[in-house]
């Protein structure tokens, strides 16, 4: 599973969002058609779970029953494309979400109310990422988050919205549309917090810290850094086991005293056992830290 898919699947397991989230979803992946002298709305995605999420969202919000259709792409990837198809109440949905002008090309940016309200902004960013966003796998060491927009002014409004949350967002225009993007790891982690993907934020941070620790080892070229590298090497097995626990049963399933040691070990892979002991909220002995680390390793080995 790609990291992008992992984030999106975490988002759809959160409680259903508000109208601002749905507005972003429809604005970025919806299209209008005319059949039997009435409008119909199509919302497309390549993820079946997201299609079901959108289906339930519309069904619950407007008490109508959409339809899910799919077809196979004819390109080399041959992915399935899922379409949430709405025939009833389309005019009501467009009016309620203030999207009519957007579909007819009169207003392609983001509603001022969304740009001025933090909660509305968070919901809109969640919907925008869910339907048109991607994150480069942090394992690659090259950090990038992107959201694709058909219109440049929408991409620029997205950047403005992100900047409200102190993110260094930029835009770039392509022939087929425009992209709003983040390239700093800290900005991407903050974005994940803003949209509610807390588990993926922790995974991203753990991977980033692990990569940095490995890079520190590779750069060790004198006695001092060699000693740090030795400490980091000794902690790698435990850090990998902590990540394994995060990916399976979750760190929150551990007793609080093990959670505290695990969080410190991942955050500070260069710390000696004594430094970990001293950094705890209630400092303990080196043997106490070693005992807790052995417990963490055993839990991971048993998974």
UniProtKB/Swiss-Prot annotation:
Pfam families: HTH_WhiA, LAGLIDADG_WhiA, WhiA_N. SUPFAM superfamilies: Homing endonucleases (SSF55608). It comes from the Bacteria. Keywords: Cell cycle, Cell division, DNA-binding. The keyword Cell cycle applies. One of its GO terms (biological process) is regulation of sporulation. Residues 272-303 bind DNA. The keyword Cell division applies. GO terms for molecular function: DNA binding. Involved in cell division and chromosome segregation. Belongs to the WhiA family. HAMAP family: HTH_type_WhiA (MF_01420). This is Probable cell division protein WhiA. It comes from Streptococcus pyogenes serotype M5 (strain Manfredo).
């Amino acid at each position: 599973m790609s990291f992008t898919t992992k984030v999106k699947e975490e988002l759809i397991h959160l409680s259903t969002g508000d109208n601002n989230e749905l507005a972003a979803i429809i604005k970025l992946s919806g299209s209008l058609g005319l059949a039997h002298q009435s409008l119909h709305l199509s919302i497309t995605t390549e993820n079946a779970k997201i299609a079901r999420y959108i289906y339930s969202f519309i069904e619950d919000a407007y008490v109508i029953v959409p339809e899910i259709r799919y077809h196979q792409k004819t390109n080399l990837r041959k992915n399935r494309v899922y379409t949430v198809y709405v025939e009833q109440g389309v005019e009501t949905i467009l009016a309620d979400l203030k999207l009519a002008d957007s579909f007819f090309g009169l207003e392609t940016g983001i509603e001022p109310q969304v740009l001025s309200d933090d909660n509305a902004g968070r919901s809109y960013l969640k919907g925008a990422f869910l339907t048109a966003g991607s994150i480069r796998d942090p394992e690659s060491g090259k950090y990038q988050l992107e959201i694709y927009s058909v219109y440049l002014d929408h991409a620029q409004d997205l950047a403005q919205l992100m900047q409200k949350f102190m993110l260094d967002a930029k835009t770039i225009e392509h022939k087929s549309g425009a992209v709003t993007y983040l390239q700093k790891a800290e900005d991407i982690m903050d974005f994940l917090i803003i949209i509610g993907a807390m588990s993926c934020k922790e995974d991203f941070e753990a991977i980033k810290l692990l990569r940095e620790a490995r890079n520190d080892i590779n750069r060790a070229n004198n006695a001092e850094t060699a000693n740090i590298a030795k400490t980091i090497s000794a902690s790698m097995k435990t850090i990998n086991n902590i990540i394994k626990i995060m990916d399976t049963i979750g760190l929150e399933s551990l007793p609080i005293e093990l959670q505290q040691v695990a969080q410190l070990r991942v955050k500070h892979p260069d710390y000696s056992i004594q430094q970990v002991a001293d950094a705890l909220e209630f400092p303990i002995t080196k043997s106490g830290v070693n005992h807790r680390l052995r417990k963490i390793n055993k839990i991971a080995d048993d998974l």
